[in-house]
Swiss-Prot record:
Pfam families: DUF489 (PF04356). Belongs to the HflD family. This is High frequency lysogenization protein HflD homolog. The keyword Transport does not apply. It comes from Hahella chejuensis (strain KCTC 2396).
Amino acid sequence: MSYNLENQVIALAGVFQSAALVDQLAKQGTVAPTSYECSLKSLLKVDATSTLDVYGDIYGLQLGLKELIAVLERKQDRKKVDVVRYALTLLYLEGKVNKRGDMLDVMSQRIAQINTQTLHFEPTHTNIISAFASLYSDTISTFPQRIQVTGDPRFLRVDENADKIRALLLAGIRAAVLWRQVGGRRWKLFFMRKKILQIANGMLR
């Protein structure tokens, strides 16, 4: 995959989309279905030929692009401060994962196993979501710094929602890994903000 800013914006939108979906689920008990499916399916795209191929098409990433643009334009709704916190923590945790070859191997093996399950179940089926959630718990959740999800206890107490949140956080890690693979670095968010904004706005439909 090419080291260019367009690919980095796509991957970064994937990070922010996962963060936004976690926030929706935690506070509203529901998620935007198209965005949700797009993010989950990205976990299964292990042989993608391009960054966009990971997500299928740019339409599935519209939520992530909107969130990214709002942050870079500094027009983020105060009610969505948690989205930024989740996204930045995902980028931080990816850095930790990147140093753990053993963990990356485990994740790769487990994703391959989950991929075989999709021969019988849709990516959004509870069995697949549960498998993603278990993978997140066995790997990313073992780091001292965890993502503390805040929201309505009525929704957070539901086991199915908890699994969905973990699956979405795993998708966020996947996007952060992709972002690094195509040359993404945190300093670019500050020093290349205007260019990233221009590209993200061009992708927005």
